[in-house]
Amino acid sequence: MIKFFLMVNKQGQTRLSKYYEHVDINKRTLLETEVIKSCLSRSNEQCSFIEYKDFKLIYRQYAALFIVVGVNDTENEMAIYEFIHNFVEVLDEYFSRVSELDIMFNLDKVHIILDEMVLNGCIVETNRARILAPLLILDKMSES
């Protein structure tokens, strides 16, 4: 099960955070700081899976952005690693080569995409067309 999903830039600034189980706001800040430090301090040659406290961190770097997913011990690391890539492919398709600015200025749409893919910490959809369908309908409605 996914515990949290973070998008962070190289400077350590959180661009998106989504928690699938309750974490107190003060603990979130500390958790994010430690998780970001753990991922940013690693070299490209090191593994993208980290054992951290009572869960695992799986991360991928895309240009200046890191996507970090915290999961429980029973989750398949490779499945989450590929899920991260699928998420970025969906963003690329919707935004035509997604950038950090796209995420910052369209955070609501990024949350919609993530919510279509993950429900209560479980991956429920990976098909790009079905993930983007609600957003495309919203876009058509806003044009009218």
From Swiss-Prot:
Return the protein name: AP-4 complex subunit sigma-1
Summarize the subunit comment: Adaptor protein complex 4 (AP-4) is a heterotetramer composed of two large adaptins (epsilon-type subunit AP4E1 and beta-type subunit AP4B1), a medium adaptin (mu-type subunit AP4M1) and a small adaptin (sigma-type AP4S1).
Which organism's genome codes for this protein? Answer: Homo sapiens (Human)
What does the similarity note say? Belongs to the adaptor complexes small subunit family.
Query: Main site of residence?
Result: Golgi
Tissue expression profile of the protein? Widely expressed.
Q: Tell me the membrane topology, using the record's own terms.
A: Peripheral membrane protein
**Cellular component per GO, a single term:** endosome lumen
Q: Name one GO biological process term.
A: protein localization
What disease has this protein been linked to? Spastic paraplegia 52, autosomal recessive: A form of spastic paraplegia, a neurodegenerative disorder characterized by a slow, gradual, progressive weakness and spasticity of the lower limbs. SPG52 is characterized by neonatal hypotonia that progresses to hypertonia and spasticity, and severe intellectual disability with poor or absent speech development. Some patients may have seizures.
Pfam families the UniProt entry points to: Clat_adaptor_s
